[in-house]
């Protein structure tokens, strides 16, 4: 009873803190010069990480096994992974706007985990025989960490695409306006066109465009490195899962839905890393592959659980109302 109450308290404290954190991050994005809200949000995210760590330890003691046996526990661990990825760059780079994505991911996953939809699996249960192995920590933790890293990296790529295509849209819109002006041969219009050209050239080198260019470079830089880290975790998770499957079921690979989609996820991000080796495919082209990978991860992690079939069906659940 004590552990259950403590778990309930830690869950709501961490969710409340991360809700405040994402609000402060939005304020920081609206006003880039506001430093104090940013520092407060980072300290709040560290507090969230500590609360989630305490929550996982409490559930571990309460249940008697590592808390990765069902979808609820995996969502809490995913939130913990997001918060870990969030605070690591903070200790290296004190000011980093990219952490807004990880804060949003944390509040989304934790909000879903603590919602009424997963009420039926909030209480710890006895592990099924297939999960009573030392490989549980190795395999499942690596897979969840890989999902967290790959999702964060993919979201950075999505942001890169949005900013890039937005710039292209406004640039083409401006060019169409200039072409319309060229259809008139009046001296006054010609003068305005020349003035617009000078303005455009000046604007190109303005502080706003310089900041956008730097921000796009940061998005590309971090997405590549975070996805590379996630790909390593995914590879380790798949290999350890194959060894565990051989011990539990007598075969390294069975092509059940979860294994199939994990393999598809691995292929997609292997293609992404390959595109990074080609200079002509970097930037928006590789970001498109990562965006596809974002959808594939959610199918692999969450979508397959809705089916409730295959060797990994113990992680499935039924949607219920609160």
From Swiss-Prot:
GO terms for biological process: cytochrome complex assembly. Keywords: Chloroplast, Cytochrome c-type biogenesis, Membrane, Plastid, Thylakoid, Transmembrane, Transmembrane helix. One of its GO terms (cellular component) is chloroplast thylakoid membrane. Signal peptide: none annotated. It holds the Pfam family Cytochrom_C_asm. The chain crosses the membrane at residues 9-29, 44-64, 71-91, 98-118, 143-163, 226-246, 253-273, 287-307. Disulfide bonds: none annotated. It is a multi-pass membrane protein. It is found in: Plastid, Chloroplast thylakoid membrane. It comes from the Eukaryota. The keyword rRNA-binding does not apply. One of its GO terms (molecular function) is heme binding. May interact with Ccs1. Required during biogenesis of c-type cytochromes (cytochrome c6 and cytochrome f) at the step of heme attachment. Belongs to the CcmF/CycK/Ccl1/NrfE/CcsA family. This is Cytochrome c biogenesis protein CcsA. The lineage of its organism: Eukaryota, Viridiplantae, Streptophyta, Embryophyta, Tracheophyta.
């Amino acid at each position: 009873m004590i552990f259950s109450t403590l778990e309930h308290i830690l869950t709501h404290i961490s969710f409340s803190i991360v809700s405040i954190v994402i609000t402060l991050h939005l304020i920081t994005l609206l006003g880039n010069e506001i430093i104090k809200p940013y520092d407060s949000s980072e300290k709040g995210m560290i507090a969230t990480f500590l609360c989630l760590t305490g929550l996982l330890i409490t559930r571990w003691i309460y249940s008697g096994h590592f808390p990765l046996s069902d979808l609820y526990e995996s969502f809490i661990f995913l939130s913990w992974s997001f918060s870990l990825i969030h605070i690591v760059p903070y200790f290296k780079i004190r000011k980093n706007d990219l952490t807004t994505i990880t804060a949003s991911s944390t509040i989304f996953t934790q909000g879903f985990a603590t919602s009424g939809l997963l009420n039926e699996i909030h209480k710890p249960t006895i592990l099924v025989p297939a999960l009573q192995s030392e490989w549980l920590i190795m395999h499942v933790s690596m897979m969840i960490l890989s999902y967290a890293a790959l999702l964060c990296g993919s979201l950075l790529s999505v942001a890169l695409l949005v900013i890039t295509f937005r710039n292209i849209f406004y640039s083409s819109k401006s060019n169409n306006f200039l072409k319309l002006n060229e259809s008139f041969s009046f001296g006054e219009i010609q003068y305005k066109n020349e003035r617009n050209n000078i303005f455009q050239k000046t604007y190109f080198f303005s502080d706003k465009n310089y900041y956008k260019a730097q921000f796009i470079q940061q998005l590309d830089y971090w997405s590549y490195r975070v996805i590379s880290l996630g790909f390593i975790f995914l590879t380790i998770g798949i290999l350890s899962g194959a060894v565990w499957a051989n011990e539990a079921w007598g075969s390294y690979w069975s092509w059940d839905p979860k294994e199939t989609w994990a393999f598809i996820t691995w292929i997609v991000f292997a293609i992404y890393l390959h595109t990074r080796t080609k200079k002509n495919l970097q930037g928006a082209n590789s970001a498109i592959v990562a965006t596809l990978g974002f959808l594939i991860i959610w199918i692999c992690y969450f979508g397959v659980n809705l089916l409730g079939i295959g060797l990994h069906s113990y992680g499935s659940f039924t949607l219920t109302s609160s």
